[in-house]
Regions:
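Active-site-adjacent pocket scaffolds in enzyme catalytic domains
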Residues: 18-22, 26-113, 161-169
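A generic secondary-structure micro-motif detector
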Residues: 6, 30-31, 128
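Short alpha-helix boundary/capping motifs
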Residues: 10, 34-35, 132
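C-terminal domain-boundary segment and adjacent tail
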Residues: 99, 103-183
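Loop/helix-junction capping segments adjacent to catalytic residues or to phosphate/diphosphate-binding pockets
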Residues: 3, 38, 128-129
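A short, flexible beta-alpha/helix-coil linker loop
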Residues: 1-2, 81-83, 123-126
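Glycine-rich phosphate-binding "P-loop"
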Residues: 1-14
């Protein structure tokens, strides 16, 4: 959607919601475009039907964004702990490389506490036996640690919204000069 107008992107978003609802029987609760525009998250927020948007690789925890009167929860995706790196130069060459990277990432996040580790998976890549074994080994490793929760993005969004509800603050950049000086 890099060069798409907001009107085209909105029409496509509405059609995708309609089609998903028709096929699945309910509307989608989250959105991941993957090749989004500068308008994608704002348009999703304005639509108002998504618990979360995943079009961000900006953090290890969910966060809120504001668009006018619309608040949108973002549950970040990942490009580093992602099996797509099997298909790119300087990526993972073996299942063992993938396992070691996931393990190292997990160990840091687990030590920090209260973090989310997203792992990007694609059937055509992770579905190979040696790679699938590496994923199975990593899941067993992570599961051997106390307090680890394997959750869907919807579960993460629900938990984050319940425990970290969005609070709006006055931003100096949005204040009049008089208000800014008075504060």
């Amino acid at each position: 959607y890099k060069d798409a107008t907001p009107e085209v992107e909105t029409a496509d978003l509405n059609e995708a919601i309609r089609l998903h609802t028709e096929v699945v029987g309910e509307a989608p609760v989250g959105l991941y475009i993957g090749r989004c525009s500068d308008n994608t998250v704002r348009l999703a927020a304005e639509n108002g039907s998504f618990k979360y948007v995943a079009d961000s690789i900006a953090d290890d925890v969910p966060y809120w964004m504001e668009f006018g009167e619309h608040d949108q929860l973002v549950v970040p995706y990942t490009m580093d702990a992602n099996d797509m790196r099997f298909a790119t130069p300087q990526g993972f060459n073996t299942g063992a490389h993938f396992f070691e990277y996931l393990k190292a990432s997990f160990d840091v996040l687990y030590a920090e506490g209260g973090r989310m580790m997203s792992i990007g998976l694609h059937c055509r890549l992770m579905g190979r036996p040696g790679r699938a074994q590496a994923l199975q080994d990593f899941l067993a490793y992570a599961n051997s640690h106390e307090g680890v929760w394997f959750a869907t993005r919807e579960q993460i969004a629900d938990h984050w919204a319940a425990t970290n509800p969005h609070t709006r603050y006055e931003r100096p950049s949005e204040m009049s000069r008089e208000t800014f000086v008075a504060k």
